[in-house]
Amino acid sequence: MKSPSSLAFLTEALRRLPGVGPKSAQRMAYHLMQHDRDGAAMLGRALSQAVERVQHCAMCNTFTESAVCETCLDAERNAALLCVVETPGDQLMIEQTLTFKGLYFVLMGRLSPLDGIGPKDIHLEKLISRATDGIVQEVVLATNFTNEGEATAHYISETLKARGLKVSRLARGVPVGGELEYVDAGTIARAMLDRRTT
C-alpha cells in the first residue's frame, strides 16, 4: 500500500527536522492525521505565521518580528560588551542565566569547511562591522565547544584581535563537545563569569 501523496509530503517535510528519521517522521504524520487533526492544523498555522513574520534583526542577526530585536533596543544593555553565539537558542540559554547584560551577535551557524560553510555563511563581515563600530570594547565568544565551534571561535578571535579588540572565550565548564542549548543555566552562568581572554 502506498501513502496518499499529501501524507507522503507531510512525512517528507517532518524529516527535515533535526534528529527525525523516516520512521519517526512517518509515525508523527500518521499520529497527527489519526489522533490530532486540530494539533496538525495548529502546527500548520504556526509554521505559516512564523515563516511569514520572523526575520533577522538588522543589528544582531537573531530572530525577531521587527527590524531590530528587543534586546538590541534595550537601553539598559551594556553596548560595549558583545557576545557571539551560534544560534538564537544559544542566545536564549545565556539570557536565562541572567549573568550577561551586554548585546549579542548570532552567527546562525559555525565554520565547517567539510560541509562547505565558510566565513560568509556565518555573517562574519556583519560581525566585524558590528564589533568595530567604536562602541564595542570586548567580544565574548560563546560558540559551542565542538570542533567546529572551537575553530569558529579561533577564527573570529584572530580576526578581531588583529583589529585591536579585546576578545574573551567562555570558560570551560561547558563540556567539550557540548552544545549550549543542552547545558543547564548554572553551568553557562559559571562559564560566563569565568570567561578568559583569548
Swiss-Prot record:
ZnF bounds (C4-type): 57-72
Biological process terms from the Gene Ontology for this record are: DNA recombination; DNA repair
Q: Which domain of life is it from?
A: Bacteria
Pfam families given in the database record? RecR_C, RecR_HhH, RecR_ZnF, Toprim_4
Q: Does Zinc-finger appear among the keywords?
A: yes
Q: Which CDD domains does the UniProt record give?
A: TOPRIM_recR
Give every Toprim domain span.
80-175
InterPro entries for the chain: DNA_Rcmb_RecR, Rcmb_RecR, Rcmb_RecR_Znf, TOPRIM_dom, TOPRIM_RecR
Q: Which PANTHER family did the record assign? A: RECOMBINATION PROTEIN RECR
Q: Which family does it belong to?
A: Belongs to the RecR family.
Summarizing the function annotation, the protein's role is: May play a role in DNA repair. It seems to be involved in an RecBC-independent recombinational process of DNA repair. It may act with RecF and RecO.
Name of protein = Recombination protein RecR
Q: Which organism is it from?
A: Herminiimonas arsenicoxydans
Gene name in the database record: recR
